[in-house]
Structure formats: C-alpha cells, structure tokens
Amino acid sequence: MSRYRGPRLRITRRLGDLPGLTRKAAKRSHPPGQHGQARRKRSEYAIRLEEKQKLRFNYGISERQLVRYVKKARAQDGSTGTNLLKLLENRLDNVCFRLGFGPTVPGARQLVNHGHVTVNGRVLDIASYQCKAGDVVAIRERKGSKKLAEANLEFPGLANVPPHIELDKAKMSAKIISKCEREWVALEINELLVVEYYSRKV
C-alpha cells in the first residue's frame, strides 16, 4: 500500500487532528461520506485499525514501512508501542517537521529528498534516516534552501520543538541532545492498540 495522496481534510475528519499530515482543521466533526453522521458502535478491530491509520497518515508512511517498524520495535528492549513511536519520531523527515523546517511531514520530506537538509555537515536525502543523540540537523548553506525553511519557520505547523532537540533558529540548525521520550510525541495516539492490531498479522 503506497502513501496517501488524496484530500487530507477527509482523513482528519475521520481520524481527528494529525499534526504531521496537515495544518488545517476539519470544519465538520463527523466522518466523511453519505453515512458519516450516523452513530454506530465500532468493533474492537475497527478501533485498532483507526489507531494504526493515525500512525500511517501522520508520519506519511506506507503499510509496508509501518510493518517493518513494528518488527524493529518488537526486537528492541522495552515497550513495543513506545519503541514504535520513538522510531517514527526519530525519522529525519519528522525531525525536520518538529523543528518547523517543513509545514507538515510530507513538506519536510520534500525538503530532505531535494537535498536541502544536512546531518552532521553532510547533505542527506534519506527521509527515513534515524536521527540519534549527537546528530546536528541543519538547513543547507544555500540561498534557495534557506528561503524555503525561513518561510516555514515564520508560520510553523501544528507540532512543537520537543525537549530533546535544541534549535538555533538564526542558524537554522538543531542538535539532538538526548533520546526522545514518549510524552514528547505530538500525536494523540494509543500505541498499544496499534501493537494489538499487528499481533496476529506480523
């Protein structure tokens, strides 16, 4: 399953606020579609599926990528759900979004893919790169790159800079000073339901 490229507000009406997907808030509170306002009891499977979809759409990843992250999270010590969120938060495109370099995760990914971002002084165009403590993430020293980031920093998206990252706005550079903690995740999500969703699938 590839990344979603359709109307973003349609997704937020169904799943709630997704800071990584869009800056805009849905005007209608009920889900899209002809029967969107109908009230019906959701099954446990539907609830788990919804939480899984929140992760996919917020971080802009495909189903195949998410399955890989779930497997990685399971292989690590500690809570699988917390490990999963940390893996997604540490992606380079998400870090750039949290810093305000991009208005959304897809916008930040575009900056990375087009060579506007450096890690430890070298241009890195791999959006899935796992940022770690000690890494310095910055906007490339190039007029076009700086201009793009300046516009985004002036009107930042819905995420904020988490405590484990120190941002120097003037230099458009940030240093990751520690590991990401669960409470610093901007998305409202029940990661345990995501783990349960994949418990029999992966």
Curated annotation (Swiss-Prot):
GO cellular component, one term: small ribosomal subunit
Entry-linked SMART domains: Ribosomal_S4, S4
Keywords recorded for this protein, A-Z: Ribonucleoprotein, Ribosomal protein, RNA-binding, rRNA-binding
Disulphide bonds in the chain: none
Gene3D superfamilies per record: Ribosomal Protein S4 Delta 41, Chain A, domain 1, RNA-binding S4 domain
Source superkingdom: Bacteria
MF terms in GO: rRNA binding; structural constituent of ribosome
Ranges of biased composition (kind: Basic residues): 1-13
Ranges where the record places region Disordered: 1-43
GO biological process terms held by the UniProt record: ribosomal small subunit biogenesis; translation
Ranges where the S4 RNA-binding domain occurs: 90-152
InterPro entries recorded: Ribosomal_uS4, Ribosomal_uS4_bac-type, Ribosomal_uS4_CS, Ribosomal_uS4_N, S4_RNA-bd, S4_RNA-bd_sf
PANTHER family attached to this UniProt entry: 30S 40S RIBOSOMAL PROTEIN, SMALL RIBOSOMAL SUBUNIT PROTEIN US4M
Recorded family membership: Belongs to the universal ribosomal protein uS4 family.
Described purpose of this protein according to its UniProt entry: One of the primary rRNA binding proteins, it binds directly to 16S rRNA where it nucleates assembly of the body of the 30S subunit.
Self-association and partners: Part of the 30S ribosomal subunit. Contacts protein S5. The interaction surface between S4 and S5 is involved in control of translational fidelity.
Annotated protein name in UniProt: Small ribosomal subunit protein uS4
Species name: Prochlorococcus marinus (strain MIT 9313)
